[in-house]
């Protein structure tokens, strides 16, 4: 079984609390054999994303992922904002939908594959993305990372 994940890089996110929680667990996930790809701050699909959401654009867009998309065995898909964490599970502030349809699952899988294309992501195991991040952002992630946030992340 292969599990591939595409998520936000530190460069592509403004949610430093969530990133710090993920960052604390990243090595464990890699050690388990997961393939982790992190979204670039300037993906090749940037113009497509801008055009798609132009009406929502109020300032310089941050190219981050928020929706969670999952395809299992090519025929079952999940799309939602649910974070697969205790906070989302217990406070019920997120939503998601499970779809059992091959054609829809295939379309979602193609969108995920596009996000994972090399021009849109970094390989979390191979790249040194921190060179693209300012000192203050690194410091904030480090500080968030030492707080006991595990129960809610």
Question: Which stretches of residues belong to each language-model region?
Answer:
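PLD/PLD-like phosphodiesterase catalytic module centered on the HKD motif
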Residues: 1-153
């Amino acid at each position: 079984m292969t599990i591939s994940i595409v998520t936000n890089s530190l460069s592509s996110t403004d949610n430093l609390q969530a990133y710090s929680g993920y960052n604390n667990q990243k090595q464990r996930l890699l050690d388990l054999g997961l393939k982790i790809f992190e979204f670039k701050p300037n993906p090749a699909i940037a113009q497509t994303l801008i055009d798609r959401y132009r009406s929502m654009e109020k300032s310089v867009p941050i190219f981050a992922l928020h929706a969670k998309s999952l395809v299992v065995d090519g025929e079952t898909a999940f799309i939602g904002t649910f974070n697969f964490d205790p906070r989302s599970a217990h406070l019920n502030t997120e939503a998601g939908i499970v779809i059992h349809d091959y054609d829809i699952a295939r379309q979602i899988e193609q969108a995920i594959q596009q996000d994972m294309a090399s021009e849109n992501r970094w390989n979390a195991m191979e790249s040194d993305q921190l060179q693209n991040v300012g000192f203050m952002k690194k410091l904030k992630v480090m500080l968030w990372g030492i707080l006991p946030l595990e129960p809610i992340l």
